[in-house]
Amino acid sequence: MACDLILVLDAPSPRDIAPVLKRLSGTVRWAKIGLEMYTACGPDCVREVADLGYNVFLDLKLHDIPNTVAKAVESAARLPIKMLTLHTCGGREMMSWAAKAQQQHAPELLLLGVTVLTSMSAVHLHEVGVPDSPEAQVVRLGRLAVDAGLRGLVCSPLEIAPLRAALPSDVTLVTPGIRPRDAAADDQTRVMTPAEAARTGANFLVIGRPIFKAPDPVAAARDILAELKS
């Protein structure tokens, strides 16, 4: 199974990292815009990154009542994006409405359900009233998302194998919590190396700090991509 790299843009604006983005554009095909950048500069940042040649993954983790999320998906579909996230804990109806909006307004857009954040452990889940392990909760939410019409999920690398066993093979798995062996885990608790995640069945690996903090970001990205192909 082919596995590709998504570059996390951890900055308030594309202009703040423009030199590195331009250097990486010939090596990395995908870029993720999250809440920090989108809140700071809105849809313009999506267009700027797309204009540099990247496929844009807009990671907004939508979570609201069904009608509001469906309208947000409709609005996002007007942007040059390839992927968009929502929280699976918003429930079946919310995800179903979102999936219908996506199919109507952007059939090629991949709507991804976020399961359990990679910063959360079993202790954190228990604190918010979830008695099960992260793995059990991810599989439960993953099944619910697919039943509601989603064709992709975001999960930690530790839940790739259980999801592959529980879901149809054509479900796309996007995996943060990826750290090369010599990189710090930072604020993530459920992590894996790029090669391990690819072998386990991930379709996309979401990586930011290990590339941007490297002395040579282009070399770091190329090393990860080579590891995925080996």
From Swiss-Prot:
Substrate binds at residues 10, 32, 59-68, 118, 179, 188, 208-209. InterPro entries: Aldolase_TIM (IPR013785), OMPdecase (IPR014732), OMPdecase_AS (IPR018089), OMPdecase_bac (IPR047596), OMPdeCOase_dom (IPR001754), RibuloseP-bd_barrel (IPR011060). Its EC number is 4.1.1.23. The keyword Lyase applies. The keyword Lyase applies. GO terms for cellular component: cytosol. The active site is at K61 (proton donor). GO terms for molecular function: orotidine-5'-phosphate decarboxylase activity. GO terms for biological process: 'de novo' pyrimidine nucleobase biosynthetic process; 'de novo' UMP biosynthetic process. Pathway: Pyrimidine metabolism; UMP biosynthesis via de novo pathway; UMP from orotate: step 2/2. NCBIfam families: PRK00230.1, pyrF. Belongs to the OMP decarboxylase family. Type 1 subfamily. Homodimer. This is Orotidine 5'-phosphate decarboxylase. It comes from Opitutus terrae (strain DSM 11246 / JCM 15787 / PB90-1). The gene is pyrF.
